[in-house]
Amino acid sequence: MQRYFLKIIAPRDAFNAEGKAPADVENILRQEGFKPLEIRAPRWDDLLGINARLCYQPLEKLLQKAGELFIQYPFYAPHSHLIIRKILHTNLPLTVLVHDLDMLRGGREESEPLLRKAKRLIVHTEAMKAFLCKQGFNGENIKVLQCFDYLVEHLPAQKPSFTGGNDIAFAGNLEKSEFLKLLSGNKILSSLHFLLYGATLPKDVFGENLTYQGCFRPADLRTLNGSWGLVWDGESLTTCQGSHGLGEYLRYNASHKLSLYLASGMPVIVWQESGVAAFVNQNHLGLTVNSLEELPERIERLTENEKALISEGVGIMSEKIRHGEMLRNCLKN
């Protein structure tokens, strides 16, 4: 029978990389023979859920023709509990790919029954899998993505061989990245040059070793430059701990920044305690550090052999994630 993926009809912002991960998943699923099971969501001002019930009414009949259903979790739609309820009442083989989990921040997972119903649950990292197993999930049903795929339209021009330079790219929401304010005033980091990519540059982020590079469409990486790509968050240069359980969440999460940098052929710098640190080390994808203040010495001490291993590892992984191999591997079993 036909395999389907649930598609909630909603607009996306072309410059918002947060919407790129689910869009890439949909494209890979189409290539693998999945068809969209489309549901048009009502307006968010449908407070009583009257229009939602009308919009979601066809879902029950649509589910009857599906042989398998793939869901990206969480999905955002008004009164989404109505959709979940209909899915829970079917006996469809269900695959759920997790993008985010409130329970990792100490919150309550309102749609936990949907996760537990999944025949195949795809999560970010081994750490996220271990967490769910402690919550009573069946580990045999959990597949680990390691990092998200990142499909591209345009790559940067052919880069010279990796030499372990001091130019470090950071792409994302610059307004929320509090640690950026501390970069220019830190003498230990004065030998490094940070290239900042984002929609706007905060007024309190400035310095001789910082250059604002503007923004780019997530699928067009031609303007992304740097010797390294930085995956960091929080309010400190010496750790990724921050408010709202940020540090704890990074222990499980695979940031989409990681995929962005690797897709462009750029080695990465990640927090040693993050959920992706082991993946980065095992595949020779860059450096893992406890503090950004370690970077000048760590970069300077790199041997030619280590640089060659990183260059090779990044090249192999870049090819995989640009062709959707991470998700395809999870779909095989």
List each language-model region with its residue ranges.
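Nucleotide-sugar-dependent
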Residues: 222-264, 270-278
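Membrane-proximal helix-turn-helix segments that form the acceptor-binding/catalytic region
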Residues: 89-91, 102-121
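A short acidic/histidine/glycine-rich donor-binding loop in glycosyltransferase catalytic cores
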Residues: 283-289
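A short, active-site helix/loop in glycosyltransferases that binds the activated sugar's phosphate group
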Residues: 106-107, 118-142
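A charged, aromatic-enriched C-terminal amphipathic alpha-helix characteristic of glycosyltransferases
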Residues: 290-293, 297, 303-333
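N-terminal pre-catalytic "stem/leader" segment of glycosyltransferase-like enzymes
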Residues: 1-83, 88-93, 104, 273-278, ...
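Alpha-helix capping/helix-boundary segments
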Residues: 76, 102, 127-129, 175, ...
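Conserved catalytic-core segment of nucleotide-activated headgroup transferases in glycan assembly
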Residues: 150-225
